[in-house]
From Swiss-Prot:
Gene from which this protein is expressed: LACZ
Catalytic activity: IMP + diphosphate = hypoxanthine + 5-phospho-alpha-D-ribose 1-diphosphate; GMP + diphosphate = guanine + 5-phospho-alpha-D-ribose 1-diphosphate; XMP + diphosphate = xanthine + 5-phospho-alpha-D-ribose 1-diphosphate
The protein's name in its UniProt record: Hypoxanthine-guanine-xanthine phosphoribosyltransferase
Lineage summary: Eukaryota, Sar, Alveolata, Apicomplexa, Aconoidasida
The organism of origin for this protein: Plasmodium falciparum (isolate K1 / Thailand)
Entry GO MF terms: guanine phosphoribosyltransferase activity; hypoxanthine phosphoribosyltransferase activity; magnesium ion binding; nucleotide binding; xanthine phosphoribosyltransferase activity
UniProt-listed SUPFAM superfamilies: PRTase-like
Compartments where located: Cytoplasm
Length: 231
């Protein structure tokens, strides 16, 4: 697989793990914080499964970039858990390779993006970032938590064009099977999940539930409890 450079096309992408519509686990089977439990329906993807899948994604990414230097953009805040685990595995895989390099394999950068209030997209994208002009002529991998409608990544990739980046690829932990999806595909995907609002593993509902270890479904009571006052 060549280094991807057609954001949204998902050309030559590996298949994600498919989570069926009726998949899930009883909350009592896992360690769930007591203050969250009544606001959740079920565990959709357990923490251990998420971690192992991220390790495999790191392996796939390393195979594609091989020993080419690349820069990883973390889209905060939802991607933080995925990004941290991915970097850990990429570093370990690279450190155990026999190749000597004069510089680190990858650089890391952080961009704050926000497009949701409650469980709805606001239709606008707020971007706060460091100076990304250093990415000119570089390979860039965007790390996103979830592709829902796909609108966030379309707008963000458009934003990146002014920096004259060499290649742009996308890694996302989850892609949601929703009729609202605009067709934007990632190049490295962890899981294909059903059309439900998910929280946990750094995914939030109005900044709540990020600290859940597992990917879970939030129920209507939870949405009402933590609903923002305005869109």
């Amino acid at each position: 697989m060549p280094i991807p450079n057609n954001p949204g096309a998902g050309e030559n992408a590996f298949d994600p793990v498919f989570v069926k519509d009726d998949d899930g686990y009883d909350l009592d089977s896992f360690m769930i914080p007591a203050h969250y439990k009544k606001y959740l329906t079920k565990v959709l993807v357990p923490n251990g499964v998420i971690k192992n899948r991220i390790e495999k994604l790191a392996y796939d990414i390393k195979k594609v970039y091989n020993n080419e230097e690349f820069h990883i953009l973390c889209l905060l805040k939802g991607s933080r858990g995925f990004f941290t685990a991915l970097l850990k595995h990429l570093s370990r895989i690279h450190n155990y390779s026999a190749v000597e390099m004069s510089k680190p394999l990858f650089g890391e950068h952080y961009v704050r993006v926000k497009s949701y209030c409650n469980d709805q997209s606001t239709g606008t994208l707020e971007i706060v970032s460091e100076d990304l002009s250093c990415l000119k002529g570089k390979h860039v991998l965007i790390v996103e938590d979830i592709i829902d409608t796909g609108k966030t990544l379309v707008k963000f990739c458009e934003y990146l064009k002014k920096f004259e980046i060499k290649t742009v690829a996308i890694a996302c932990l989850f892609i949601k099977r929703t009729p609202l999806w605009n067709g934007f595909k990632a190049d490295f995907v962890g899981f294909s999940i059903p059309d439900h609002f998910v929280v946990g593993y750094s995914l939030d509902y109005n900044e709540i539930f990020r600290d859940l270890d597992h990917c879970c479904l939030v129920n209507d009571e939870g949405k009402k409890k933590y609903k923002a006052t305005s869109l």
